[in-house]
């Protein structure tokens, strides 16, 4: 039947379920299904922005695309055509990094000669030549995690290489010398690190003074423990704008936020010009969500066995249909335990062959050699049966190997922790999140996952 009303989590947060939600009761578990949201209808004025119609600066940077996607096309006139502050709240996979790239190109265009629009007559086959005043500006991109920072650096560095623009990471792991900072135009950093840089009144004033654009990715984390740091950064930037009459553009990117109006006010966004909110109807790939609750007291061996069984039933059904599945767990040691439990269930049920990689692909020698070299015994054992694990405690080389095996289809089921979700885009048809409580070391207790996680 349908479900109405609000539900309280055990921590007092209210949740409401969307219309059309169905609930099914089984002997040992119950399941709530949230249907796919209907795609948002197209507005009659909506036209995709074609790359060939852009000026040479954008055209050459977005060269491998033919057009911007739906959300990017709607936001393009504001992102690239104005200096308005922006808050973009959109579903995952909406191409927010490219919207940020449009605002970066807007900043670069202001320090380019000749001006990009003066070269619009250039035919599309000719590579434009720009001289960029490299030392005149800095662009700061604040990413929530180091893993994401590395991914953003790689993307922007390769896209903007043709202009000679340097993009570097400045995080707890990656320090930059003064000379490197001076030679870099785009600095990708974490909230905590940028807080340290801007906090020192006598510190890097040259660096801070040259900032023309501040992009805050995953700004919905304002709600989490680290929100205060992000809040401080933004307030400090706004104070700098007022005190020095300098022009710094603020761009916030987030998942679909409930309180987007508050966040946009805080960012100083003009709600009629710079506020863009897209709901789940704009997801490029529709998402159907199933919440499965297992009976019994959470954390007891009996409940855990039941959880593994229900998890296996799901995974086996998906793999039998030819799909790859990622199973997220909340502790490193659980990755191995869950993978082994799923494999054991498959052996008992006689379905293990469905999980094994196809014979013809199992002989990729280059990868086989790398697997043989790995010291991770548990990982190697599981790989034979098409299972694998991924968590931050593994060696970088092993993690990269697992990612490659999964993207080539040689691993059917990957048990991993959330570090994988933050920084790596792997092509899974379905994602299973096993258990909804994580250990919070600051509270010294298990807490519910936030719905954004």
Which role fits each region the language model picked out?
Residues 117, 133, 141, 157-168, ...:
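Conserved C-terminal RecA-like helicase domain
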Residues 121-193, 265, 389:
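Conserved nucleic-acid-binding Ia/Ib motif block in the N-terminal RecA-like helicase ATPase lobe
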Residues 77-82, 98-133, 235-240:
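Walker A/P-loop NTP-binding motif
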Residues 173-188, 396-412:
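Conserved motor-coupling elements within RecA-like helicase/translocase cores
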Residues 249-341, 388:
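Conserved interdomain linker/interface between the two RecA-like ATPase lobes of SF2 helicase motors
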Residues 191-195, 202-244:
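SF2 helicase catalytic motif II
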Residues 413, 420-437:
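A short beta-strand element within the Helicase C-terminal
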Residues 1-77, 83-87, 112-127, 344, ...:
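Helicase-associated low-complexity/disordered flanking segments
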């Amino acid at each position: 039947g349908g479900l109405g009303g609000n539900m309280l989590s055990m921590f007092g947060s209210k949740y409401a379920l969307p219309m059309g939600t169905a609930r099914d009761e089984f002997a040992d578990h119950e399941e709530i299904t949230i249907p796919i949201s209907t795609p948002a209808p197209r507005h009659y004025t909506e036209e995709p922005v074609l790359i060939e119609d852009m000026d040479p600066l954008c055209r050459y940077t977005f060269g491998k695309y033919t057009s911007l996607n739906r959300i990017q096309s709607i936001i393009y006139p504001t992102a690239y055509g104005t200096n308005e502050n922006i808050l973009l709240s959109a579903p995952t996979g909406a191409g927010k990094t490219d919207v940020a790239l449009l605002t970066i190109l807007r900043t670069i265009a202001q320090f380019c000669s000749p001006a990009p629009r003066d070269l619009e007559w250039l035919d599309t086959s000719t590579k434009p030549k720009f001289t960029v005043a490299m030392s005149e500006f800095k662009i700061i991109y604040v990413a929530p995690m180091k893993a994401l920072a590395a991914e953003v650096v790689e993307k922007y560095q390769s896209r903007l290489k043709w202009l000679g623009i340097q993009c570097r990471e400045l995080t707890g792991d990656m320090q930059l010398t003064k000379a490197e900072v001076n030679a870099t135009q785009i600095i990708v950093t974490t909230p905590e690190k940028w807080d340290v840089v801007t906090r020192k009144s006598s510190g890097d004033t040259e660096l801070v003074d040259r900032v023309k654009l501040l992009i805050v990715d995953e700004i919905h984390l304002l709600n989490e423990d680290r929100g205060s740091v992000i809040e401080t950064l933004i307030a400090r930037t706004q104070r700098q704008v007022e005190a020095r009459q300098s022009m710094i553009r603020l761009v916030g990117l987030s998942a679909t936020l409930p309180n987007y109006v508050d966040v946009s006010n805080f960012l100083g966004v003009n709600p009629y010009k710079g506020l863009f909110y897209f709901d789940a109807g704009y997801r490029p790939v529709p998402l159907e969500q199933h919440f499965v609750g297992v009976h019994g007291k959470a954390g007891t061996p009996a409940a855990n066995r039941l959880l593994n069984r229900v998890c296996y039933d799901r995974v086996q059904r998906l793999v039998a249909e030819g799909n790859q599945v990622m199973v997220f767990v909340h502790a490193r040691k659980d990755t191995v335990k869950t993978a082994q439990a799923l494999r054991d269930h498959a052996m008992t049920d006689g379905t293990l062959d469905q999980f094994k990689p196809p014979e013809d692909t199992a002989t990729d020698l280059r990868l086989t050699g790398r697997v043989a070299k790995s010291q991770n015994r548990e990982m190697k054992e599981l790989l034979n049966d098409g299972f694998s694990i991924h968590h931050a405690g593994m060696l970088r080389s092993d993690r990269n190997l697992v990612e490659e095996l999964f993207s080539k289809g040689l691993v059917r089921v990957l048990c991993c922790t959330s570090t994988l979700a933050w920084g790596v885009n792997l092509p899974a048809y379905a994602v299973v999140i096993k258990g909804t409580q994580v250990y919070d070391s600051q509270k010294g207790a298990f807490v519910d996952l936030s719905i954004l996680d």
